[in-house]
Amino acid sequence: MSNPRRLARRARMLRWLLNLYPPYLGAGIRIQHIGADMRTARVRMKLARWNRNYVGTQFGGSLYSMVDPFYMLLLMEQLGRDYIVWDKAASIDFIAPGKGPVYAEFHVDDALLDEIRQQTANGKKYLPRLQVDIRDGAGELVARVDKTLYVRLKPQARQA
């Protein structure tokens, strides 16, 4: 893991780059916050003409897109270069129509990092399942996304 200043700079740069990413710009997705310690993120998507579906609510593909990379990115930063981290699978459960701006918050804590390190210490893959809720401005649940990640300690980092 990087030193705190370097990590904070990386967080600011990542937020800036993602906010300029054309698919996010086009969908009205904004990264509002990435924690200086790269353990948290908050993403917002407004409802606009170009991201509405046929019935005038948030397009489901955009709802998924707004949450797609964040657990992978946060874990990559926390675990460091000795680990392989990939998105493996995802599912989204649409609970209620998104009729306005929606938000998602991501949190990576010590317990998750410790579990991943313990499960991968022997060089085997680990498939943590993480969940993120997408909520509207009133805090009502709009969708729930389940993500499965693939995490493995790189061969050169394994103990003999």
Identify the meaning behind each predicted range:
Residues 26-31, 88-94, 115-117:
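Short structured motifs
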Residues 30, 91-93, 105-107, 133, ...:
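Residues located in well-ordered beta-strands
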